[in-house]
């Protein structure tokens, strides 16, 4: 088990799991990440990448880029697949969990609202308003289908020992 910056990972493992990191790597770093995953997986190793995504390639919203996630880039499913193609991974499963994530964000909004006074004391009113706007907008975007939550399972090599279904 390794919990570290992906660039520091050494050794080989049976599995590589990344939750909510790909959208923060930056598209220019996908080839390096792909090579690292390939190098880190044992033969027949399995990987799962889970990332916020979009319907098509586009620049990040300027407000979110500035206020919430500087440098983030949620990929389209095609860009996600390019990462897999770069290292000749065998894609086994692609799932879109966007409605699950909309519900998660809704719970986050409820918790944020319940603790809004504490958050404002820790930061300021501007921060609180920005995050409420971000959470509300994200809930709407996931529900409407303009944001996605992709989960992709793939192997290094032809691992035919895995279950044929979820």
Task: Give names to the regions the model predicted.
Residues 52-164:
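Substrate-binding/catalytic lobe of Class I Rossmann-like enzymes that use SAM or dcSAM, i.e.
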Residues 30-33, 49-51, 57-58:
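Serine-hydrolase catalytic core recognition
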Residues 7-17:
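A short acidic, Gly/Pro-enriched loop at the edge of an enzyme's catalytic core
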Residues 1-6:
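Conserved SAM-binding strand-loop segment of SAM-dependent methyltransferases
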Residues 31-46:
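A short glycine-rich, Lys/Arg-flanked "PGG" loop and its adjoining helix->strand segment in the class I
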Residues 18-23:
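Residues lining the SAM
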Residues 8, 24-25:
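A short His-aromatic
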């Amino acid at each position: 088990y390794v919990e570290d910056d992906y660039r520091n990972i050494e050794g080989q493992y049976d599995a590589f799991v990344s939750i909510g990191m790909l959208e923060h790597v930056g598209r220019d770093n996908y080839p390096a990440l792909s090579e690292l995953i390939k190098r880190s997986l044992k033969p027949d190793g399995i990987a799962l990448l889970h990332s916020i995504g979009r319907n098509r390639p586009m620049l990040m919203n300027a407000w979110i880029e500035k206020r919430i996630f500087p440098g983030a880039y949620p990929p389209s499913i095609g860009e996600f697949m390019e990462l897999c193609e770069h290292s000749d991974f065998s894609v086994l499963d692609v799932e879109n969990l966007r409605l699950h994530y909309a519900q998660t964000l809704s719970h986050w909004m409820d918790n944020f609202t319940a603790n809004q006074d504490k958050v404002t004391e820790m930061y300021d009113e501007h921060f609180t308003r920005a995050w409420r706007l971000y959470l509300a907008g994200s809930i709407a975007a996931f529900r409407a289908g303009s944001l996605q939550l992709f989960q992709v399972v793939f192997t290094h090599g032809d691992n035919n020992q895995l279950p044929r279904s979820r």
